[in-house]
Amino acid sequence: MAVDKAWLRPGMKVAVVSCPALGDTTLFLRLAWRLHAAGAQVTLVSAPLYPAREYLPDLEVVGDARPDIVQLAGQHDLVICYIDWLILASRAGVDLLPLSNVAYLAGKKLPRQFRLEQRSVTVAGQVLAHAHSVICRDPKAGKTMVQWIDLYAQEVLGLDPAVPIPGLKALPPVAADADRRLAIFPTTPHASKNYSSRGFRRLARELVARGWQVEFVGTPAEQASLQRQYPDYTVNAFSDLKGLIDFLRSCSVVVSNDSGGGHLGSLMGLRTFTITRRRPDFTWRPGFNAFNSVIHPRFTFKWMGETVWRPFIPLSRIWDALSKVSQ
């Protein structure tokens, strides 16, 4: 798909409006970095990233929990916005559709009622074809969401994927013993995605026996409950994303369910293992580096309408892989 890149002039103002979910936030951050690398002056609207803005000096990070899309559209040449903000505005009686310089991105599906495929996005009088889009255009293609957001940047915005992006900067130094420290994120916002606490305890015991220092990570609201489930281990909880980023600088490996912790770890260059019932090439696996593995069940079966998968997770794949890294 050939794209005329003439729309993007050096210094052009672009706002990228993310959503609260950590995994999605990492994708919008990557898109913001790509736009900055192409010469745009980028404002990233993200409440989760605002406390960590000192690590994002190349972007203007705004922490609005409920962004004013109308105001952003008036202040920027282009706004790329997570679809939920359009939905929420519509429910509140605010019509954002006349804003012709706002492009909406959804994960896998654009809501039909807005008929976005019939609306053009224009920047300085130039039409950006297909700017309203889903990030993942084909969930069976085997691509990660990182690869999909890069394709959007390349095919819709005309950005060169070979241009290096800035990444996080001015981070705390990596801990001296990080190569033997591992963080487990045992929960997600969706209980059906969570691996069993018994399985995580077994994994932690095996890793400790092999010389790893294992700690767990949850939200502040989960911390007390998780500490009861994992009494032999430190359970960390952080009030903001900066605290979590600082903690992960003390680790080299993240084990998680299908959750934001794995995406953040991957973004930071850590080795990740994602425990999920889904197939190994599922779209939402971490994909920011080459050291991401999906641990999925050897088989599953249905019982009383539920998929049984947790007993069949091959945890040995994790400690075997880490043993090879240590050699």
Regions found by a protein language model. Give the residues of each.
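Catalytic machinery of carbohydrate-active enzymes
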Residues: 1-327
